[in-house]
Amino acid sequence: MEETQQELTQQLKELETLMAAINLDDSKKKQPIYQNSSESEESETENKNFIYDFSSEEDFEEPVKVKIEEEAETSNKRKFDKNPEFTRFKYQKIPKEYVPAHQTTSTIGVLDIDCVANTEKIIKEWFNHHSILITINEELKNLSSLDTFYYLVYKTRGIAHAYLSNLPSEVLSRIPADRKQVDDWVYNLLLREFVGRLERPESEEAFSQNNYYKLINLEICNMCYLENFLCEFQSRYYGINPIDRENLKVDLLLYAKLPEYVRTQVEAYFNASITSNKLDNTLGGRITALKLWQTEQCNQKLAKRQASVGLCCSKIEDKIGKYGCRKSNPRAKKPKKKFRKIKKYPKKNFWKWNNQRKKKTFRKKRPFRKQQTCPTGKKKCQCWLCHEEGHYANECPKKDNKKAQTLKLIFDLGFEPVESDIETDEELFELTSEDSSEDEY
């Protein structure tokens, strides 16, 4: 009997372990039971540091745990942002992917114009790069027009890739049969969609007038910003239609924008260089004449002090070197003490809180002496107690004689003290007078 009971208990234990291993209900997951509270807390912190990473396409794939390691923070202070936006308003940090930026030519092979400020320039550089590849590369020469289109789509990403890969069938049917014209067709599509430019003279004229308007309003007041001024002037100048540039004589605006003390001298220098056949009458010749005149003015010894202030000679790139010519002035050099800067934290002054509302306010009065009862200072005033002259009330001799006053009042009323012995109570209330006699009683 005992052996059978032991076998039954072993079988029951095995069944319990099997039932615990099998999940009868997938929706209800049992949490593990921990012996100590410390083990449970450690497991909870580990589970928080794990995330499940799996794709929605693979439904039957088990989730993979990926541990996230948190970076140790030295302080609780917020990190400094170099480019805070809208300083006049409430601070709001903008994600980097949504901040407009000027893209460089390092990623010219793939077109990416997401949140880019110079969209037209990037599309133009990308078009020039791939138009040469399509004509030179032997492998790309054998592609059809449709394959060339898909190759150009492959070389894009972001919003440009989303636009070209989702073109309707009506637009795709207009792909030119000649593979050499596919890149021009794609380039015009991108300009029309992301810049708004059309292949029509009206559109070109509108963009030309916009550049001319910006060029007219361009100004420079400080010669230290000459390079920035010339860079923007050139970009606006070559954005204007060549016919309009000649008719409007836009190149003359370069010297007209300069400050007054520079304009007349630079024009005279440029005209002299043209007559001597040193420079050509182009925009590049005018810029070169301006820079040459600036260097000559800065190198003159007489006007050196004036030129260094007005022409910003310190920022000239093409300078004449003077190596080892600067004389040292020992008097100007002062020995500097090397010391370690110690941060001083100012002590906070704890002021006692004082509520000014609770204070009573008093008007300022003119100081004066209190009027005396006897202004002469002599004792001729009447006493308040006895109504007699010759002394004050505080010196009155009758001030403390209250008993004498009461006795006087009693005698004035006709009462006299009883001197004889009283034998009975009736004698106490007996009234006597001088005129009365003993027979009347």
From Swiss-Prot:
Membrane-spanning residues: none
UniProtKB keywords: Capsid protein, Host nucleus, Metal-binding, T=7 icosahedral capsid protein, Viral penetration into host nucleus, Virion, Virus entry into host cell, Zinc, Zinc-finger
Biological process (GO), any one: viral penetration into host nucleus
Keyword field contains Ion transport: no
Function: Self assembles to form an icosahedral capsid, about 50 nm in diameter, nm, composed of 420 subunits of the viral capsid protein. The capsid encapsulates the genomic dsDNA. Following virus entry into host cell, provides nuclear import of the viral genome. Virus particles do not enter the nucleus, but dock at the nuclear membrane through the interaction with host importins.
Region (Disordered) residue spans: 26-63
Family: Belongs to the caulimoviridae capsid protein family.
Cell location: Virion; Host nucleus
Predominant place of localization: virion
Organism of this sequence: Soybean chlorotic mottle virus
PROSITE patterns: ZF_CCHC
UniProt motif Nuclear localization signal: location: 77-79
Zinc finger (CCHC-type): 381-398
SUBUNIT field: Interacts (via nuclear localization signal) with host importin alpha.
The protein's name: Capsid protein
Molecular functions per Gene Ontology: nucleic acid binding; structural molecule activity; zinc ion binding
GO CC terms of this entry: host cell; host cell nucleus; T=7 icosahedral viral capsid
Keyword Magnesium attached: no
